[in-house]
Amino acid sequence: MRNSLKIIVILLLSLHLGACASTDALQLSNGKGKSFTVSGKNYEQIWRAANVAMSNDMKIVDRHKPSGVIKSRVVNGTPGKIVGFFIQPTDENVPSYTVTIVSQKPLQTDFVDRDWEPSVWEDFKTAINSK
């Protein structure tokens, strides 16, 4: 009986861990997500607004300013869902930047699930326009 309980607990833990999406899966090069062009702002302004947007109902788990990458895990909402925010180029002053937002939830299917997060784009626009 005791061994059965241990096995059940181990199985439940592995199912739970297996259902979490890894932030490593969020890559700009995989063709997923949605891209937007941002003009009239510099890299620092975009970076600050991206951090605000990626902190709203999410916890930032990876951030690398030199490469323009922020990755967050959703706190309120779909458990295990992750979101990536990619800024290109990372030069300080260029005419326009491309912002790509990619999201993935555990056991996501391409047929039903969206691969980006509209609320992050809305939060980003609010943050960048409030400065």
Label the model's feature ranges.
Residues 16-19:
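C-terminal motif of bacterial Sec signal peptides marking the signal peptidase cleavage site
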Residues 1-8:
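Bacterial N-terminal signal peptides that target proteins for export
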Residues 21-131:
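Ser/Thr-rich, low-complexity intrinsically disordered terminal regions
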Residues 11-14:
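Short, linear, compositionally biased motifs with a strong N-terminal bias
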